[in-house]
Amino acid sequence: IIAIANEDKYPTMSVFKFHIAVTALKKMEAENIPLDKMVYIKQKEMLKNTYSPLRDKYPDQGIRISYRDIIKYTVSISDNNTCDWLIRFVGGIDKVDSYIKSLGIKDMNFTETEESMHTDIMLCYNNWSTPLAIAQLLKKLHTENILTKEHFAFLETAMLDCVSGKNKLIAGLPTDIKFGHK
């Protein structure tokens, strides 16, 4: 892997949702939780002052939803409420940070949730990564069987289905190019 401008710490912004999804899927594997298991997200967990297509679809109520759909909302649509739900599910943002670092990915740091970043936008700089660290995690996912084949394929599809950033990363690429991202 060749890295350019890798000495800087770049705020991950919503890219950290990828790391959260990897951590959540790994916890699901460890606890034998199927993707289609239903859970209940309480209305009070659906914060109003943040980007949340799920909350907009089901306003002023809790919702029964599968882990599969929570991860899709988080990765493919960039929903902040489902992101924070996954952070709570894995045991906190520090669990995401320590799990990714346990894989040998060191040049990154996660200390903030979507909720905390919305209270103070400057906190987004506390969640950072080098470009190489993200590339290393992607490579490990492809080469080291970190996730089961089912979970890897699911996450890959969620990334390919990502609706955000169409005017940035993939703008101008031929339409037959497959480009997965978060």
Regions from the PLM with identified roles:
Residues 1-6:
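A short, well-structured edge-of-sheet supersecondary motif
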Residues 11-39, 74:
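Active-site SXXK
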Residues 15-19, 125-160:
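Active-site-proximal alpha-helical segments within enzyme catalytic domains
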Residues 26-46, 93, 148-153:
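Short, well-structured active-site flanking segments
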Residues 46-84:
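Conserved catalytic neighborhood of penicillin-recognizing serine enzymes
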Residues 70-75, 86, 99-100, 138, ...:
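Short alpha-helical scaffolding segments that buttress acidic/His motifs in well-ordered protein cores
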Residues 84-143:
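Mid-domain, small-residue-enriched loop/turn segments at the edges of structured enzyme/sensor domains
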Residues 167-182:
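Short, Gly/Ser/Thr-enriched beta-strand-loop segments that form substrate-interacting elements
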